[in-house]
């Protein structure tokens, strides 16, 4: 680590501790050359995989787009912002856990449907109707019947 005061390359760590609920490491450093002390913070770079769309194009993961789609499905439903944010965090965590650099958008869509199903069945049906492009009432009935038959997976 370069000293911000004199630019020397050699610094030593005097103290390290976890901060921000264990999400960061705070390090107190001292420059070997000039003796000045300074603090650094380290955070893991947690990169989400790129998405492969159905047409084969690739695009970066867009958390805001995901949030907007879920909010649209949950509109006027009794689900708190905290529960929505927890569902988003769970989806992002699962995506990181794949260890893949790229993931098909279909995988993300299925994760969203699973999370919405746990949050609110009406929101799940709303999202499924758009995501799966329902064409008529029979497709709604089939999905509602499947919802009644199969318990939500945790």
Swiss-Prot record:
| GO process annotations (BP) | negative regulation of DNA-templated transcription
What are the names of the required cofactors?
A: Zn(2+)
Instruction: State if DNA-binding is listed as a keyword.
Output: yes
Gene Ontology molecular function: any one? zinc ion binding
Q: What's the record's note on cofactor binding?
A: Binds 1 zinc ion.
Q: Determine the domain of life of the protein's source.
A: Bacteria
Q: Which UniProt keywords apply?
A: ATP-binding, DNA-binding, Metal-binding, Nucleotide-binding, Repressor, Transcription, Transcription regulation, Zinc, Zinc-finger
ATP-cone domain: from which residue to which, for each copy? 49-139
Zinc finger regions, unnamed = 3-34
The family assignment reads: Belongs to the NrdR family.
Q: What does this protein do?
A: Negatively regulates transcription of bacterial ribonucleotide reductase nrd genes and operons by binding to NrdR-boxes.
What name appears for this protein in its UniProt entry? Transcriptional repressor NrdR
Q: Which organism is it from?
A: Pseudomonas putida (strain ATCC 47054 / DSM 6125 / CFBP 8728 / NCIMB 11950 / KT2440)
Source taxonomy: Bacteria, Pseudomonadati, Pseudomonadota, Gammaproteobacteria, Pseudomonadales
